Amino acid sequence: MAAGKFASLPRNMPVNHQFPLASSMDLLSSKSPLAERRTDAYQDVSIHGTLPRKKKGPPSIRSCDNAGHSKSPRQSSPLTQDIIQENPLQDRKGENFIFRDPYLLDPTLEYVKFSKERHIMDRTPERLKKELEEELLLSSEDLRSHAWYHGRIPRQVSENLVQRDGDFLVRDSLSSPGNFVLTCQWKNLAQHFKINRTVLRLSEAYSRVQYQFEMESFDSIPGLVRCYVGNRRPISQQSGAIIFQPINRTVPLWCLEERYGTSPGRGREGSLAEGRPDVVKRLSLTTGSSIQAREHSLPRGNLLRNKEKSGSQPACLDHVQDRKALTLKAHQSESHLPIGCKLPPQSPSMDTSPCPSSPVFRTGSEPTLSPALVRRFSSDARTGEALRGSDSQLCPKPPPKPCKVPFLKTPPSPSPWLTSEANYCELNPAFAVGCDRGAKLPMQAHDSHEMLLTAKQNGPSGPRNSGINYMILDGDDQARHWDPLAVQTDEGQEDKTKFVPPLMETVSSFRPNDFESKLLPPENKPLETAMLKHAKELFTNHDARVIAQHMLSVDCKVARILEVSEDRKRSMGVSSGLELITLPHGRQLRLDIIERHNTMAIGIAVDILGCTGTLENRAGTLNKIIQVAVELKDAMGDLYAFSAIMKALEMPQITRLEKTWTALRHHYTQTAILYEKQLKPFSKILHEGRESTYVPASNVSVPLLMPLVTLMERQAVTFEGTDMWENNDESCEILLNHLATARFMAEASESYRMNAERILADFQPDEEMTEILRTEFQMRLLWGSKGAEVNQNERYDKFNQILTALSRKLEPPSGKQAEL
């Protein structure tokens, strides 16, 4: 550059400036010793332009000028002497010199070389340290805020960074863009583990990304790393590699990527969940050199590639079309957008994810709720016709907005005799509006009679999610006028078909003081030692499967799934308690279900904390309880009792028993692994409303009832505050899942009943085991004959203190341990 642009300048002519030409040329040379000594003087040099810029104010005195600033020429530097020797002035005496802008040789100007490498070299350590600190101060869920994340570095570089066993770092996968790799050293060997990335599509409009190695999945990579580092958990069972020492980066991510030449190209959408917010960019319908210019103007070295949007509406992040073929210059307007223009074919390297088929980008403010929704233009629109006007006039008649809450299940078509407004709270006669009850239907008499018989046998009919056909319940003598067989029915059958309004129960089905027990005296004190010992012996002497069968049998009776009489069905208005808990008059049943669940959880906790013997005895009791939970989950399908056991095991009074859990891992290793790897993740799935995805309905006899009844009766439960899923960021989505599960439970109540009967077909109950598992017995055992009648809130608060005292008695807290 120096030889080409400044070779024609005179060397010995007097020039009225403070610096010789060589001073300005020194800025352009990457090998000049002067430039190396004064990098700090050019920190504010911009790399975004190639034209010289004039500084405001008096010229600054540079640190390299030690001899003062006079108009007399300075001693030439070696670089200046070389230039003069190459181009002597006497050889060019006859030439005419045409100078450029007079400010070109002004010493206050700085020439900038547009060089990425020079820009990196000019960055001082203080500036890099400041940028690194800015990255580390981001949100803890942002991958860039963790120093063990090194971005896009090569595999060999990562292997050189881990030197000792336990060292680890996380980097981007260069062979599989969008994925991440954990590099660590174990047994003096560098190992690479790909972090599996799974996209869970909870609905058409919402999806989430989870990361995992083998078993448990996490919502973010920082959460995954924290779990494996904090618990010293092996990355894989085969390798046994354990990570505990992070290798931290010392420079910003962009510097690492530029240093190793691994700056990402297009298609880095894979890590959207971890990166920066999207940047709104305008689009263009022109192609050519502007595409390449826009490509080079994009910031490089980011963790994430920015998704492109159009106008003011949020584009769908799952299916963003590669906009390389269609870009919009900044000076162009959206006034002339052709309809039906055909996109150029995509190259194989481009993203081939499905995208909306409309060639016109959305520019309004209507949100995209589902990637599957495609704009439909009217058939009379001609191909290539231009739409003129503002953004709101791109479509003559905007399509209707989709429903923001997608239907989880298509409702069944209503029956001819049921109105669309019929619901559980309306027990009205089931004739269509405007239908004359006395009118005969000669053409449909036979068909209607067959429909009545079918409804009497099968139960569910019409849009109601009930097992009882309300036409039969609501029918009266006038409705029978067109039924050919109604005249032949006797009075007894007429009584059975008469409508009986459902009863609003106000008294609990649990009456501890009226409970006749063979093991308890008429009056007993709370937590009697002899009775606790006898109950523990029964629990120890029976097999885990037998105990699970007894629990299922009692649960089915409490939830009114089995052994429900016809009178009880008529008083409920439905055929199953799974339907009743979804209805307004099922409040008392919901309270009873909550009572049994909490009482059962407290009883299991007392069974563990009441072991005053050796540490091995407590570990054995814990092992037996976990085995019962496995049987309830796999063999019995009793998710209600399973959740009660998991609630007991996750109480703070139980989880703090470190010695007990350590003894369980030593003596019952397989059980401990089963609890950590299978039961806890499965319990989390249940409480997030995803059991329909992971649990086949044919294997469930008693579904998970607690989320629904707790939502409907929140003011009655203060034992544990909010549930675990209510503190989740996706609590609204989980709430919708629980409500959809409640609808499914009401519809599939008959299926649950058949599953329970099949599982308990050959069951022979033991009287004493059945008694100790009944709610009335447990209430009297825990609170005594007098305390069992006290209000729920008082009973739970007092017993919470009792459990805390028992836990501290078994394993006294250390001085540094926080209180429960």
From Swiss-Prot:
Which Pfam families would you find in this protein's record? RasGEF, SH2
The site annotation (Required for interaction with NEDD9) covers 743
Is the keyword Cytoplasm in the record? yes
* Alphabetical keyword list: Acetylation, Cell junction, Cytoplasm, Guanine-nucleotide releasing factor, Methylation, Phosphoprotein, SH2 domain
Q: Which residues carry this modification: N-acetylalanine?
A: 2
**Which GO-annotated molecular functions does the record name?**
guanyl-nucleotide exchange factor activity; kinase binding; phosphotyrosine residue binding
Q: Which CDD domains match?
A: SH2_BCAR3
Residues annotated with N6-methyllysine modification: 329
What effect does gene inactivation have here?
Knockout mice are generally normal and viable. Retinal white circular lesions in anterior chamber derived from the lens cortex. Retinal lens is partially opaque and irregular in structure, with rupture leading to cortical lens fragments floating in the aqueous humor. Abnormally deep anterior chamber with anterior synechiae, ectropion uveae, mild to moderate retinal ganglion loss, and a small pigmented pre-retinal membrane overlying the optic nerve. Reduced phosphorylation of AKT1 and BCAR1 in lens epithelial cells.
Conditions for induction: Up-regulated by IL1A and LTA, in thymus cortical reticular cell lines.
Q: Locate the Ras-GEF domain: which residues?
A: 543-813
Region of interest (Mediates the interaction with BCAR1/p130CAS), residue spans: 739-743
Where in this protein does the record put region Disordered?
40-81, 346-367
SH2 domain span: 148-247
Q: State the PROSITE patterns in the record.
A: RASGEF_CAT, SH2
Its annotated compartments are: Cytoplasm; Cell junction, Focal adhesion
**Expressed in which tissues:** Abundantly expressed in the lung and brain, with lower expression in splenic lymphocytes and liver (at protein level). Expressed in splenic lymphocytes (at protein level). Expressed in the lymph node cortical region, periphery of the splenic white pulp and in alveolar lung fibroblasts. Expressed in epithelial cells in the lens equatorial region and early stage nucleated cortical lens fiber cells. Expressed in the thymus. Expressed in B-cells.
Post-translational modifications reported in the UniProt record: Phosphorylated on tyrosine residues.
- Provide the positions where the record notes the PTM Omega-N-methylarginine: 437
List all membrane-crossing ranges. none
**Cellular compartments per GO CC:** cytoplasm; focal adhesion; membrane
Task: Please give the function described in this protein's UniProt entry.
Answer: Acts as an adapter protein downstream of several growth factor receptors to promote cell proliferation, migration, and redistribution of actin fibers. Specifically involved in INS/insulin signaling pathway by mediating MAPK1/ERK2-MAPK3/ERK1 activation and DNA synthesis. Promotes insulin-mediated membrane ruffling. In response to vasoconstrictor peptide EDN1, involved in the activation of RAP1 downstream of PTK2B via interaction with phosphorylated BCAR1.
Q: What quaternary arrangement does the UniProt entry report?
A: Part of a complex comprised of PTPRA, BCAR1, BCAR3 (via SH2 domain) and SRC; the formation of the complex is dependent on integrin mediated-tyrosine phosphorylation of PTPRA. Within the complex, interacts (via SH2 domain) with PTPRA (when phosphorylated on 'Tyr-825'). Interacts (via Ras-GEF domain) with BCAR1. Interacts (via Ras-GEF domain) with NEDD9. Interacts with PTK2B/FAK1. Interacts with PTPN1. Interacts (via SH2 domain) with EGFR (when tyrosine-phosphorylated).
Q: What is known of its domains?
A: The SH2 domain mediates interaction with tyrosine-phosphorylated proteins. However, not involved in the binding to phosphorylated BCAR1. Required for cell cycle progression in response to INS/insulin. Required for regulation of EGF-induced DNA synthesis.
Listed name of the protein: Breast cancer anti-estrogen resistance protein 3 homolog
